[in-house]
Regions:
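Hydrophobic alpha-helical connector segments
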Residues: 67, 81-108, 160, 164-167, ...
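Secondary-structure edge/capping motif, primarily at the C-terminal ends of alpha-helices
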Residues: 80-87, 113-120, 148, 174-182
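Helix-turn-helix
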Residues: 31-63, 67
Length: 211
């Protein structure tokens, strides 16, 4: 029998639409409006999508934000592995290179991440998604700290879970408050500062600072 034509599933179609809307929303917010100020009508008009199509896949613009954020959150968690996967003899320069990746990813999608932070204050769906991101990163960092402590390459007096919680929330707020609006020169200085802090907290005296 003839093969069936390729069909896009509903979840796949939702993902495709959310990716389409991501660039639309980034342009609209880049023009000066906050995500909260954007109406569904304005979003779908700019995106060239009918109202019926929009509501076939999204409950409202909060649901759209959850879908748009899913991709960029996955990217952010993915590049975080550059830090978790550092070898036991990784130097401070290696740490700096690893920390650059989430900073670059955040800057590339700062509009969506910023909308997540702002919308999480009043939309439980977005808040749950933000917390899920935090929980994933905290768990990964805590595992990394635990493994490094066992290997003798991180301060063994630090509580891995709570140390990870403090560090991740600090980074989350720093990305939103400091990195999102910084120019290239300032980003480099912020990267230097956060590398110094994390190195001193976890690794100083336990692994070589230079190779």
């Amino acid at each position: 029998s003839a093969p069936k034509p390729f069909q896009v599933s509903r979840p796949q179609r939702r993902t495709m639409l959310s990716r389409h809307f991501s660039s639309i929303v980034e342009n609209l917010v880049g023009s000066g409006d906050s995500y909260a100020e954007l109406s569904v009508e304005r979003i779908i008009t700019a995106g060239g999508i009918s109202r019926s199509t929009f509501y076939s896949y999204f409950d409202d613009k909060g649901d759209l934000l959850v879908a748009m954020a899913q991709d960029v959150i996955g990217d952010l968690v993915g590049v975080g592995h550059a830090w978790w996967d550092l070898s036991p003899d990784a130097t401070k320069a290696d740490l700096r290179r690893a920390l650059r990746l989430p900073i670059n990813t955040y800057r590339a999608h700062r509009t969506i991440f910023g909308a997540v932070v702002e919308t999480a204050a009043y939309d439980a769906r977005v808040r749950e998604q933000q917390q899920s991101l935090i929980d994933q990163v905290v768990a990964s960092l805590a595992d990394h700290i635990t493994a490094a402590q066992k290997a003798g390459t991180a301060d063994s007096t630090i509580d891995p879970k709570r140390g990870a919680q403090w560090t991740v929330w600090m980074l989350e707020h720093g990305l939103y408050q400091l990195v999102s609006s910084a120019d290239e020169t300032e980003v480099e200085q912020l990267l230097d500062a956060v590398t110094d802090m994390i190195w001193r907290i976890f690794y100083a005296g336990y692994r070589p600072e230079v190779g």
